[in-house]
């Protein structure tokens, strides 16, 4: 699927939902233009906030032959370029920023979704067989199964036999869920309903792994299960969300190749609203073809 197809899907889904169709971006931000970022700086300072835009735009190459080229390169990407060297080693500020980003990623994995968050969103909360974060990180197999209490809650409080069941889970990034939820779930649910699909009761699974959607789909009798789960964070990027969609999942027979994945959903990747439109189109095609993953025809 190329960019033009994605844009057409977004326009058609947003229009059917009665929302404003995204307008073409201004020339300054069209393809070929340089992304906006803080002005590059070459000053090394221990007082600089290592998570700030200024620190990310820092240029560590001393006495460059073509400073304008480095400035242009630094403005064009969020990658770790132009950091310079001190002999064979990285500059102090480059190393400190690397360590800070690594620490931020570890914090994201270890953080918990606040208990009040699910209540504030009006979501039913269930959990896997996992009881705490340490067990979640060391026993991924238990994160693939619902607790007995969760199974009872789904059977008593959720719509049975829906066309599409949407599930939200913290996964390995709490920030991915809390930062993107309001921009992806409401338009996703609205788009699915606008498409005439029977949508199940959305709910939140604490300590869930991707394969838990197989058990959920089997219990609820869902034709399509869509799992929105936090991705393992990268350095300096802790808000990336993934969508795993599967048709008619079964615990015993569904394999990873049966899933269709849309990853890198965040403001610096695929915008959540755009991802919602693409997921709606994906769910419709899954129901039409009665397939997902590698079994779908393009």
From Swiss-Prot:
InterPro entries: EutC, EutC_C. GO terms for molecular function: cobalamin binding; ethanolamine ammonia-lyase activity. GO terms for biological process: amino acid metabolic process; ethanolamine catabolic process. Its main location: other. Keywords: Bacterial microcompartment, Cobalamin, Cobalt, Lyase. Its EC number is 4.3.1.7. It is found in: Bacterial microcompartment. Adenosylcob(III)alamin binds at residues 210, 231, 261. It catalyses: ethanolamine = acetaldehyde + NH4(+). Binds between the large and small subunits. It is an enzyme of class 4 (lyase). Pfam families: EutC. Catalyzes the deamination of various vicinal amino-alcohols to oxo compounds. Allows this organism to utilize ethanolamine as the sole source of nitrogen and carbon in the presence of external vitamin B12. The basic unit is a heterodimer which dimerizes to form tetramers. The heterotetramers trimerize; 6 large subunits form a core ring with 6 small subunits projecting outwards. Belongs to the EutC family. This is Ethanolamine ammonia-lyase small subunit. It comes from Salmonella typhi. The lineage of its organism: Bacteria, Pseudomonadati, Pseudomonadota, Gammaproteobacteria, Enterobacterales. The gene is eutC.
């Amino acid at each position: 699927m190329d960019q033009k197809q994605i844009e057409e899907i977004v326009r058609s889904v947003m229009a059917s939902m009665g929302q404003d169709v995204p307008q073409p971006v201004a020339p300054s931000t069209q393809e070929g233009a340089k992304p906006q970022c803080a002005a590059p700086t070459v000053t090394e300072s221990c007082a600089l906030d290592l998570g700030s835009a200024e620190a990310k735009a820092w240029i560590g190459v001393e006495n460059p032959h073509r400073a304008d080229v480095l400035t242009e390169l630094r403005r064009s990407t969020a990658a770790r370029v132009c950091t310079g060297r001190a002999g064979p080693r990285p500059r102090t500020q480059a190393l400190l920023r690397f360590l800070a980003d690594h620490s931020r990623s570890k914090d994201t994995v270890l953080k918990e979704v606040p208990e009040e968050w699910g209540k504030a969103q009006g979501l039913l909360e269930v959990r896997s067989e996992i009881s705490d974060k340490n067990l979640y990180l060391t026993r991924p197999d238990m994160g693939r199964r619902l607790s007995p209490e969760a199974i009872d809650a789904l059977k008593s409080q959720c719509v049975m036999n829906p066309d599409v069941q949407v599930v939200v889970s913290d996964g390995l990034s709490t920030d991915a869920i809390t930062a993107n939820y309001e921009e992806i779930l409401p338009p996703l649910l609205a788009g699915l309903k606008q498409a005439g699909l029977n949508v199940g009761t959305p709910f939140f699974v604490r300590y869930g792994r991707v394969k838990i959607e197989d058990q959920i789909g089997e219990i609820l009798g869902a034709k399509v299960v869509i799992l929105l789960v936090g991705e393992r964070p990268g350095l300096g990027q802790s808000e990336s969300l993934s969508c795993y969609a599967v048709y008619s999942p079964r615990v015993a027979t569904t394999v990873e190749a049966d899933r269709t994945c849309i990853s890198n959903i965040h403001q610096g990747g695929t915008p959540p609203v755009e991802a919602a439109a693409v997921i709606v189109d994906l769910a419709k095609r899954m129901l039409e073809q009665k397939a997902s993953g590698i079994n779908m025809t393009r």
